[in-house]
Amino acid sequence: MLPLPTLAQSLLEAGKTDVGVLYIDSESVNTVKKDGKYYLAFFAEEKYTDQTFLASLRQGEDMQNAVSAITLYLFNTFGNEYIIGANYIVDSEGKVCADLGADMTPVDARNNATMRNAYTMALKILQRKSKQ
């Protein structure tokens, strides 16, 4: 699978979330094959902006400096569902505060404009990479 990236210089804003802003790491966009299926994979960083959420999150053990989440998203070939290959809470230096693991339960992305945009952006990046 893909390694946990350092906080990349290649973050592109995909949109707002309930508690922050989602950025995709354009350098991490790739295709992967898992269990016989192909996925569009990329790391994304959700930078938390909701102060109430941050205050609550920082109550946890080793979470005092948490500022964002780094997540490995794997979208199906249609872009309507994704699974989470890895999920980490990190501090401002990119150090892992918590490893939240993977979630292989498919999530419907059709009604989430930010996730649909993230998929579309990643797909365009992959298309550009393939032309180089």
Residue ranges and their predicted role:
Residues L7-I70, L74-Q132:
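N-terminal secretory-pathway/extracellular module detecting exported/lumenal segments
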Residues P3-P5:
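N-terminal signal peptide c-region/cleavage motif recognized by signal peptidases
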